[in-house]
Amino acid sequence: MKNNKDTRVVVGMSGGVDSSVAALLLKQQGYDVVGIFMKNWDDTDEFGVCTATEDFDDVVRVCNQLEIPYYSVNFEKQYWDKVFTYFLDEYKAGRTPNPDVMCNKEIKFKAFLDHALALGADYLATGHYAQVRRDKNGRVEMLRGNDENKDQTYFLNQLSEDVLDKVMFPLGHLPKSEVRKIAKEHELVTAEKKDSTGICFIGERNFKEFLSEYLPAQPGEMQTLDGIVKGSHDGLMYYTLGQRQGLGIGGSGDPWFVVGKNLTDNILYVGQGYENDYLYSNALVATDINWIQPDKISDTFNCTAKFRYRQQDSEVNVTIKSENEVYVAFKEDQRAITPGQAVVFYDGEVCLGGGTIDTIIKNDHKLDYVG
């Protein structure tokens, strides 16, 4: 085992407070720390300002404060090919993708990890709120971050055990408030910087406008599942299951929600009431399955699952259909399960892995109106 001072750790630095504190903590622990900034997207805004330039300037300032070397690496082509193309393809298919999951799988913990290892790094560290633990046999597990509100294992569900063996999450045991406090105590220039929100390549821009630049919108009818026309939609890709905002349906009674999509006829299905029965299901089929420790997964088992970020866990039964497909039965009916989103499985604090929601099931029947 190497001493810390002989162990090189490349820190993926975004210019935010989390990655800044991750680098600080590793430096304090005596590691040979190198900061690297990834440029994944040409994000010049409407005023000609490139936010990536501002973020890199913050990385430079923090690295100078910490007295560690820093570099920048460009993954724009890989990001376009592996993440953005997938993002557009999913929307074309009427689904609601999660680009953060794909970015972690293909860019941060693949292209970037390979780059770090090529630089002689022993580990790649990031500011994610998750934890890596070795069990008594030396096997690597991923645990939730201690800060329940910030835990990011949902977005890291596609990482393999081999990848996690080369990864450090220095913030995993800390609450966010403590991370801010550490940054202020050490007067890091990013201490007061607000957290980035939304999809990285959209930034603060209007989602509808952004998407329409790449996919032509096809307006069509809004109908109930009984065929009653309630208005028109701007394009199916702009709507997701359970959505209430932006439907423009007036009148009295309960509010209206998106309950499904018909891609063939370009119809957006709507239903009245938050508890609308059409929004509920009791099972799903997921594909693109990744198990962090696949040899420990049995053919059928009980665990908990999340169907969206920051959702409470739900009890489920998982049946393996093939290497790339699972059937997930819910103990209690779930509302607005959305194709394209991630389903992530847990055994207590341990993240088992996850997949992409493909098909929604109710009483043993596929819900065709979901898309």
UniProtKB/Swiss-Prot annotation:
The keyword RNA-binding applies. Belongs to the MnmA/TRMU family. This is tRNA-specific 2-thiouridylase MnmA. CDD domains: MnmA_TRMU-like. The record marks H128, Q341 as: Interaction with tRNA. ATP binds at G12, M13, S14, G15, G16, V17, D18, S19, M38, G127. Catalyzes the 2-thiolation of uridine at the wobble position (U34) of tRNA, leading to the formation of s(2)U34. The active site is at C103 (nucleophile), C200 (cysteine persulfide intermediate). GO terms for biological process: tRNA wobble position uridine thiolation. Keywords: ATP-binding, Cytoplasm, Disulfide bond, Nucleotide-binding, RNA-binding, Transferase, tRNA processing, tRNA-binding. One of its GO terms (cellular component) is cytoplasm. It catalyses: S-sulfanyl-L-cysteinyl-[protein] + uridine(34) in tRNA + AH2 + ATP = 2-thiouridine(34) in tRNA + L-cysteinyl-[protein] + A + AMP + diphosphate + H(+).
